[in-house]
Regions:
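Beta-rich accessory regions
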Residues: 1-228
Length: 229
């Protein structure tokens, strides 16, 4: 097998910030992603899973930038099912503290697409009693940012639906302080966007046409990337 997955992540800024654990590097998507927003859905002060799922029921999203701030529930697993992918909160992982000692902290995780490998976990401690989680979901890519970028992870994935829904292992209570779901448009121009944003398949017969399409779209892609900086 190859030593890489060919996954491409969205451009991010790395910043140094002083935290209770000392100086840390934060990773956060560049603001240019806002140029790709085509529709936004915002909700606040929801108190049950039923309420959250009702709010989400009308949203069908292919490309997603979702942010949620919620209050954890003791001894309960919270599952955010985004396009068929389970992102769970409520288990734990080990992470070094400011003294370098390994400590147990709450985690957020999702299954590794390679079945023989363990789930991908990152720390997700509470800040003032709440956890903030941001998910960027492309057609075959998932990026996760916790507490403003204090912790981050990325992996390739295979979404199976266009829906978003939540669940809790105990009861129906779920305090969601804020939830924002931004639907994203494709970076490709209309020729590709109408084909679900994917480039046409390359064959011996159409290789020349595909090459011309790439040349036609290259200035647009370069402009989009530069404007996102």
């Amino acid at each position: 097998g190859l030593p890489f997955t060919q996954q491409m992540t969205f451009p991010c800024e790395l910043t140094l910030r002083t935290t209770a654990e000392g100086v840390r590097i934060f990773r956060w998507p560049i603001d240019g992603i806002r140029k790709l927003y085509k529709k936004s859905h915002a909700f606040t002060d929801m108190t049950t899973v039923s309420e959250a799922n009702e709010a989400l029921s009308e949203i069908t999203a292919d490309l997603v930038d979702m942010s949620i701030t919620f209050k954890p529930i003791a001894d309960a697993i919270i599952t955010f099912k985004v396009r068929g992918l389970d992102i769970t909160y409520g288990n734990s992982t080990e992470f070094p503290n400011k003294d370098g000692d390994m400590v147990t902290v709450p985690s957020v995780e999702f299954d590794n697409i390679e079945d023989e490998k363990p789930a991908i976990k990152i720390p997700a401690p509470t800040v003032d009693g709440a956890v903030s989680l941001r998910l960027l979901l492309d057609r075959m890519s998932l990026e996760m940012f916790v507490n403003g970028g204090a912790y981050a992870a990325a992996s390739y994935c295979i979404p199976t639906t266009d829906r978003i829904e939540f669940s809790v292992s105990k009861g129906d209570v779920l305090q969601v302080d804020s939830l924002v779901v931004n639907e994203l448009r494709s970076i490709w121009k209309e020729e590709y966007a109408e084909n679900d944003g994917t480039a046409p398949e390359v064959t011996d017969l159409n290789a020349k046409d595909v090459s011309m399409q790439w040349e036609k779209n290259l200035p647009y892609l370069e402009e989009a990337y530069i404007s996102a900086q």
